[in-house]
């Protein structure tokens, strides 16, 4: 049953948080129920809100609509370009209160905080193993399936890990985002 009031007509039956927008209310309640009604038709990953699946689809299409005005690098998400812009300014707005380490990216900061809390937010549904870092969790999930989720449009090679797929893309584009300082100094 949805509770209504004049100012905040939608109140969460699980935690009491109130909303004045039905869409935000329904999306919030899914954080409690775990309901994920929006499923990707490419890889089967499910989402609790429609905007998340639209953003996710860019992984499969390769679309990167956000372009950095300083260096031309393209990004899938608006949050990624905002964080990237800090690399040009050197700004590191996210500082850990526990150890003082600072980060350009808020997502890196949130992951770093888990070092101090020991929090393991990723749990494998297959075996129950828990993980602190999303990269380790996603890599682990591939041990339970032989399905390859990321396929190269150029050559057809498939990968179960996005980071491996992304690195492979450089074979076709010639992009080499990581340079060896030692090798460069020898040239």
Swiss-Prot record:
This protein's name: Putative zinc finger protein 833
SUPFAM superfamilies, A to Z: beta-beta-alpha zinc fingers
Zinc finger (C2H2-type): 10-32, 38-60, 66-88, 94-116, 122-144, 150-172
Single annotated GO MF: zinc ion binding
Pfam families, per database record: zf-C2H2
UniProtKB keywords: Metal-binding, Repeat, Zinc, Zinc-finger
Gene Ontology biological-process annotations: regulation of gene expression
Cellular component per GO, a single term: nucleus
Gene this protein is translated from: ZNF833P
Keyword Zinc-finger: yes
Organism: Homo sapiens
């Amino acid at each position: 049953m949805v509770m209504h009031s004049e100012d905040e007509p939608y109140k969460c039956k699980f935690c009491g948080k109130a909303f004045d927008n039905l869409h935000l209310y329904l999306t919030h309640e899914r954080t409690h129920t775990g309901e994920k009604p929006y499923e990707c038709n490419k890889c089967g990953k499910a989402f609790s809100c429609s905007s998340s699946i639209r953003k996710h689809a860019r992984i499969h299409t390769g679309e990167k609509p956000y372009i950095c005005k300083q260096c031309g690098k393209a990004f899938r998400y608006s949050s990624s370009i905002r964080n990237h812009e800090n690399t040009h300014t050197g700004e590191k707005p996210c500082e850990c209160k526990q150890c003082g380490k600072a980060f350009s990216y808020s997502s890196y900061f949130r992951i770093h905080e888990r070092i101090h809390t020991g929090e393991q937010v990723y749990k494998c549904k297959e075996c129950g193993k828990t993980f602190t870092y999303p990269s380790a969790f996603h890599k682990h999930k591939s041990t339970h399936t032989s399905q390859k989720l990321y396929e190269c449009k150029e050559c057809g090679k498939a990968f179960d890990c996005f980071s491996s797929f992304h690195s492979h893309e450089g074979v076709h584009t010639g992009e080499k985002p990581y340079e060896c300082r030692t090798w460069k100094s020898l040239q």
